[in-house]
Design a protein with these regions (language model features):
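Intrinsically disordered, low-complexity segments enriched in small residues
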Residues: 1-8, 185-188, 194-202
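Intrinsic-disorder-associated interaction segments
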Residues: 6, 46, 65-68, 169, ...
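Short, flexible coil/linker elements and helix-boundary hinge sites characteristic
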Residues: 21, 80, 192, 199-201, ...
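A short secondary-structure junction signal
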Residues: 138-143, 164-165, 195-196
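Compact, glycine/acidic-enriched structural inserts
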Residues: 150-194
Length: 220
């Protein structure tokens, strides 16, 4: 889904990068809400198969592995009942704990998979899949009403299928990525850049180029 086609304003919730020379990412606390238009492109071809993720090493500390092993089956069943299609990359990732263990979070986020979609006021549905450890932010798949497209959105609001028949209060929901794979790729890369900056791991080969492009005023 393109940002201009989404019913939510585009922003990228993440940590600051001012110490790495990215003026567009001032440090404003654990998370800042940054301009989506300033983001550089992700440095891999995204074909829906997560081929860029598969060769990466597993992480012993701070992996985002959470409850997918126990909840993904229930989510699949619920989506089958409601006719809600899940993106191929999302299904592959949530079904494979080894893939989940390759992605880590500098803020302690973890997979917090809902057991069913939540209908969205105005059309479509949310599927929660990632949560900040302190409950500051939550990330959701947004699947359109006809199921033909999806995006990733982020909100400080907690939408859960056992608590909400319909997700309202959408004013704080931000469009965060054109697809689940695009979100996962950027999330992985930016967290690895952070860990490398504090001496906990090597800078990814594509990390320096990503930062250089981000430092340019137009984000190109």
């Amino acid at each position: 889904m393109r940002p201009q086609d989404a019913p939510f304003r585009p922003h990228w919730w993440a940590t600051g990068m001012s110490e790495l020379g990215v003026e567009a990412r001032p440090d404003v606390g654990t998370y800042g809400r940054y301009e989506f238009a300033d983001l550089p492109p992700v440095p891999f071809a995204l074909d829906g198969d997560l081929s860029w993720l598969e060769p990466l090493p597993s992480q012993e500390e701070w992996p985002i592995t959470g409850n997918a092993a126990t909840e993904f089956g229930a989510l699949l069943a619920a989506c089958g009942r409601t006719g809600t299609p899940l993106p191929a990359a999302f299904a592959k990732f949530m079904a494979d704990e080894a893939l989940q263990g390759k992605v880590r979070s500098s803020t302690g986020c973890f997979i917090d998979l809902d057991r069913a979609p939540v209908r969205v006021e105005g059309g479509g549905c949310f599927v929660r899949f990632l949560a900040d450890q302190q409950g500051c932010l939550f990330w959701y798949l947004y699947v359109t009403e006809d199921g033909a497209d999806h995006a990733v959105v982020c909100s400080p609001e907690y939408f859960d299928s056992e608590e909400h028949d319909v997700a309202g209060d959408l004013g704080e929901v931000s469009f965060s990525a054109e697809s689940f794979e695009a979100f996962l790729c950027r999330y992985w890369l930016e967290n690895e850049i952070w860990f490398a900056s504090v001496g906990d791991g090597e800078m990814p080969d594509v990390g320096a180029e990503y930062l250089e492009r981000y430092r340019e005023p137009d984000g190109a």
